[in-house]
Amino acid sequence: MIFQSCDSNKKASDAPKSKSISDLSIYHLPSKWTNQDGKDIQMKNMKGKVLVMVMIYTSCKSACPRLVADMRNIESRLPKDTKNVEFVLISIDPKVDTPERLKAFAKENQMEGDQWTFLRSSEDNTREFAAVLAVNYKKISPMDFSHSNIISVFNNVGELTYQQEGLNVNADETVQKIIEEAQKS
């Protein structure tokens, strides 16, 4: 499943939303992930929440700090009473980004609340999930990756509903989409 568009801000699905899990849901993916606390989970464990996801690596010195800042900006702009929204940062460098490293990164970036989840998995699972998000990445040196800069929004049944592409872009539409999806939850 790859969702692509030429627009810089793209709507991936305008299909009717139901409480059942559609074939387009990430909750069907069998891959196992480990969070920053060392707990193993699957995507389906996040069912019922609006997910705001981005793929990064913690040793990145260029795009990832901006993506992290964009995620924090989006989170800070949500009304305080917004419920069932989880911000998920997925590592594209699972060899370096151990659960301990992810936890330290979360602390360094003031992303320690329950709404923040950091995940890592095998290279195969990471590549599969990157394909779902239409995120491309390639190791260009022992310590560096070239990668897409996309923040994805999933509804509470795991369907991709919106993507923000680029760094430091106006996040108004992203914030609005998250609020709309959270109100449906």
Label the predicted regions.
Residues 12-44, 69:
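N-terminal "domain-start" segment that seeds a small globular fold
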Residues 140-185:
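Thiol-/selenol-based redox modules, centered on thioredoxin-like
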Residues 84-97, 114-126:
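Thiol-based oxidoreductase modules, predominantly thioredoxin-like and allied folds used
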Residues 43-65, 71:
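Short active-site neighborhood of thiol/selenol oxidoreductases, capturing the structured segment around
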Residues 7-10:
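Bacterial signal peptide processing site
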Residues 103-148:
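Short, internal strand/loop/helix patches
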Residues 2-5:
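C-terminal motif of bacterial Sec signal peptides marking the signal peptidase cleavage site
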Residues 63-78, 99:
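Typically the conserved alpha-helix immediately C-terminal to a functionally engaged Cys/Sec
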